[in-house]
Amino acid sequence: MGLSSSKDIDLLVNFIENRQGATLALPWPEDYRLTLHSVENIPEISREDVQNWAKTYMCCGGELVVVGVIHKAKTRTCRGPIVLQGARGHIYVYNGFFDRSLYHVASSFHDLFSNGLRFFYPIYETCDYALDSTVALDMIAHSKSFSELLHYRNERKNAFFTLKTYPYKTFVRFCNLSMTEFSSRHLIQWRRKLQTSLLDVVFIVQHNFFGDWRELVVVFDGHGMLFCVDREESLLFIARNMSDFLKIGCLRYNENRRLHTQWFTQDTDYIKQVDEMFSRDVLCPLREHCQRSRRERGLLKICTSLVRGVNCIERG
């Protein structure tokens, strides 16, 4: 039995204990490995920590099982992002060193060893740019200030470059607001939503969204964060800065796999960061098997039945 078939928790735990320290190559990034470790063999975390992660980050599905640690090929270590398996074989990565979030990276071990860590956004920090590095570094240098990036954009109107991002290419063109279908009224609305006075258009992007070519307008704010606006005029976060964009492209527009603290609750005391407020909604990894949505649908049916009953009594 291998990892690809390990959905039974007891079998998985036994498999990891028997192969403690075994290292497996990941398809992406190519210089990263997964070394199998049980929770007892990883410093600074405990079973209680893992149980708390399940309560904090999981919509439903209960237990998480530690599989191992991600690290670079030439560095064997027990410290690093932690790979876990959850309900129905779904795979997650927890990174306490970056943003203390849980990332849903794959629906199974087969998926993980086919596609790698594409949806574990912090890993892109260590990856190459998705275009020529000289061009990328020049662009990043000019994005350090809002006014400097505006000047850089104005000098390069209509200039194209291509981001070879997963899974499709992203075609990017420098532009200003007048070169888009939007007006100054839209720009004012976006500034209000983001609560900033510094916001402007920098790119038009042609991007393949699961087989459908989308044209997105990319805007940047005074903090260097990038957001996109699609044909439905949805304002969505796509990158923390220019370096982030030139590595990840529009992947965050496609799907949000970052499970931040209690994303599934309506806790009014939890203050969302700007990137969380304007990210695409997180979907429960279990989708149609989501226990929370089943309970909510059940409650909705009960409430609907009660309302119908009351209406019948009133008409009677």
Curated annotation (Swiss-Prot):
Protein name, per record: Protein U25
Family as reported in the entry's similarity comment: Belongs to the herpesviridae US22 family.
Superkingdom of origin: Viruses
Pfam families reported for this sequence: US22 (PF02393)
Alphabetized InterPro entries for the sequence: US22-like
